[in-house]
UniProtKB/Swiss-Prot annotation:
Primary role: With S4 and S5 plays an important role in translational accuracy.
Modified residues (3-methylthioaspartic acid): D89
Positions of region (Disordered): 103-133
Subunit structure as annotated in this protein's UniProt entry: Part of the 30S ribosomal subunit. Contacts proteins S8 and S17. May interact with IF1 in the 30S initiation complex.
Protein name: Small ribosomal subunit protein uS12
Lineage, highest ranks first: Bacteria, Pseudomonadati, Bacteroidota, Bacteroidia, Bacteroidales
GO function term, MF aspect, one: rRNA binding
Species name: Bacteroides thetaiotaomicron (strain ATCC 29148 / DSM 2079 / JCM 5827 / CCUG 10774 / NCTC 10582 / VPI-5482 / E50)
UniProt-listed GO biological process terms: translation
Cellular component per GO, a single term: ribosome
Amino acid sequence: MPTIQQLVRKGREVLVEKSKSPALDSCPQRRGVCVRVYTTTPKKPNSAMRKVARVRLTNQKEVNSYIPGEGHNLQEHSIVLVRGGRVKDLPGVRYHIVRGTLDTAGVAGRTQRRSKYGAKRPKPGQAAPAKKK
């Protein structure tokens, strides 16, 4: 424990918080162009084919972004909106693509948590479409 005199001379060092999404440059979202759209496998013990896109942002930085939801319409040169948020079982993927904006379509047939997937509200009285396997 320092003495008061040591604190007068030196002071306390302020801890600097490191951003979890540095490529966004303190913006909530950024627009970008898909450079490559591909699938990758997660870390152990999980098993899947996760949909990922390499995106060049408007600030010229390139990031790996996760494409959430079932099915997507993205391909190379698609314009997307990128937000922060990592995917725990995909190393190096620290961003998410926002569904339902710009060239990214919302998830079709989504009835719950629709706002997170850019899905429109289904018409009242309309039967829910059969889920395909």
